[in-house]
């Protein structure tokens, strides 16, 4: 290398290293790792790595027969950053760093900043050039920058790349092939986004990707980095957003990974009472260390910028926030103020979200947070954590508990259906029915439903209808949309053969219809996080297990939602109506096309002047057993103006009708309550609505069509031991 080139290279390294050590290098991957480069006219690869405790480091690989010391690195800053340019190395060459520790040991480490890696069980890093990919998603990107992130539709299909669908011989598709299989299905079903379980490189299949060793490398199980770019590009071209699970909370102890990278803690907290999750067998990042902040924030931006990912679902946030998370007395130490909050992690999350959303306000930063921590989705400047969405784990736990309850006993658990509405607008919530709920012996979603075969489907249809209408964005794990009976197994594809049976095909059709209804009706997504988009009508008919409420859009259009959580036909059910006029049934979960009985369809029903539930008029309808109904609410009629009358001279005119009185709200608007890990019974609204009128209960009518017989699901085997244990909600 010529002296002038050396000088330029030296100066160029000063700024990224300085920013890295300050915790402010948000693109550290451009400097660290392995990069193809030409020096003095000779092509090769420059390697850079951070190892503050190392005595010596050399690059080893096939090119030097993995001989330690043959290609030694040197410090570029006289402190902790090591560099070496090796001429002649090329793309896809495998390498590792051989680190000499202060104890005199040699440890072989994969590159923390590698763009590509060997496929397990091998674990070497690979030289890879991520530049030069031809993207075709300009229209998608432009539209996203103009979109209203908070007040737009979001209906997420959560999936595992390797087990959604497989080739013959139980072999997974690569990223590009999977896109061609997935796009027609997602388009047909009408989901707006897919969310991928972690695709960052990981060694153990049974961890599902949550034990990451390569924070800048898409797992090579399914192809190259550019194959993954192709996957994202194709989905964007089809109008489908892509969200990724991202895991900054912890990392595994694999010897080739980040653990004790140079023989001592670098990435993990050195305090054993803070630096390890013993239950998970993983290490906790040192969130207060500047170099670790640069590493993690660079990883987040890398996926959003280099792979055009639309958002990150940040895993296990609760475990980051609390020093006593899953730790017994004596296993943790309080913070400097004597509390249990991890102050460094809180500061890191605020910095992460400020940085990401400061650059990309149209991206999603979604917290998987299961406790009562306040203001998760409020700006850091206001004391919040700065996410723009949060999973509503309280709603999920309450509703799955309620749906598992025998309908005979649901009256005594009615608060589980209504409690979430008391805090629904305290955060920007996503309603998650995720992979965590269909593993580890918990059973699939349909197998959580009580009753025999037909009853399970009826319960699930009712739940899906309720979920779609509840304020908040939506997320459903793959396979639940067609009623997979078996728990999810990452080693097998979904049970697509079930679509050969009527009930499963009909359930899939129902999910598809619900998704289309959601997308086509802004009342279900435009005002998700304010009382302006929701109003109770019947919150407390616990004896009949019925609720009714309104969803509203900004133009004043409304949908009336009525849920009957009991397998009992209810004729003559009267409830308050917000507007006088004709109400039309627009969706019925008990429709025969969806696998229901098809016995009841409400014809357009006019209001009658009978005040109820705080409204001046009411309607009387029939509720099918175990069902969710949607009704189109008539628009408010206004009085004719003088100009309107003058349009038809000579004709007899009538007096303009008096303006309608303001609609009286039912009861007192409940104050939003914070979500709590152990949720107490909800208080009833300030004003108790009149009891809905209903005659004696009638027996359920049997289905009018006979479904194709399906074998009874076999008893499920006990789940295999996973690399990652299920996360317990914070008590």
Regions found by a protein language model. Give the residues of each.
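Short glycine-biased active-site loop of nucleotidyltransferases that positions the nucleotide triphosphate
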Residues: 74, 205-209, 253-260, 377-378, ...
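Short, flexible loop/turn elements at secondary-structure junctions
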Residues: 51-53, 77, 88, 160-165, ...
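Substrate-binding/active-site clefts of carbohydrate-active enzymes
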Residues: 118, 138-151, 160-341, 605
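Arg/Lys-rich, glycine/proline-spaced intrinsically disordered segments
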Residues: 638-644, 648-671, 681-690, 699-706, ...
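Carbohydrate-interacting/catalytic domains
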Residues: 1-153, 176-186, 454-457, 466-476, ...
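Conserved alpha/beta catalytic core and glycan-binding cleft of carbohydrate-active enzymes
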Residues: 308-310, 325-491, 498, 519-590, ...
